Amino acid sequence: MAKLLCTLFLAGFVFLANAYSTDPPNPPDIENVFDGIPSIFNPVNWISNIASFFNPSNWVSNIPSILNPVNWVKKIIDINNPFTYIPDFLNPFHYFPKLNPIKWIPGWIPGLGKDRCLLPKVTGPCKASLTRYYYDKDTKACVEFIYGGCRGNRNNFKQKDECEKACTDH
């Protein structure tokens, strides 16, 4: 709590200092000659931040973050790591772990993750005749069955290859 209060107190000085800037505002009648050109061709950006020139996401101005492979690595690490690290505000080189619940949900809830393959076959009380596949843990194979259409469990696949892909290593 003390760290948070200290951080907010110091942040107030930063905002106050920025409010009383000594730089004169840009005159409205003078146009910026670099307006309208992409940021990669803008020499002002080269000077202010050389690292941004080498970042591929800045080469195309409207590239979605999902298409940037740099973001893939971070998301893969966050999903596969049981802890996500969040920075400590007063010490930028110190990170403390925050539990990532997505990593642990399959262990908490039966039927999620690889545990779904260990569930028994459930046809359900409804009267539909849908061809589905379930993983039989005794034979270690995906077996066809008739699903009633309601109140089944997650060991219920529409296609055999989907069942095999999810449950082959059991």
From Swiss-Prot:
Cystine pairs: C117-C167, C126-C150, C142-C163
Coiled coil: none
Tissue specificity remark: Only expressed in epidermis.
Presence of keyword Signal: yes
Keywords carried by this UniProt record: Disulfide bond, Glycoprotein, Protease inhibitor, Secreted, Serine protease inhibitor, Signal
A cellular-component GO term for this protein: extracellular space
Domain BPTI/Kunitz inhibitor: 117-167
UniProt site positions, description: Reactive bond for serine proteases: K127, A128
Stored SMART domains: KU
Pfam families listed in its UniProt record: Kunitz_BPTI
Post-translational modifications reported in the UniProt record: O-glycosylated.
PROSITE patterns with a match to the protein in the record: BPTI_KUNITZ_1, BPTI_KUNITZ_2
Role description: Serine protease inhibitor with activity against plasmin (IC(50)=10.07 nM), trypsin (IC(50)=43.39 nM), chymotrypsin (IC(50)=109.25 nM) and neutrophil elastase (IC(50)=446.93 nM).
Protein name: Kunitz-type U1-aranetoxin-Av1a
Organism encoding this protein: Araneus ventricosus
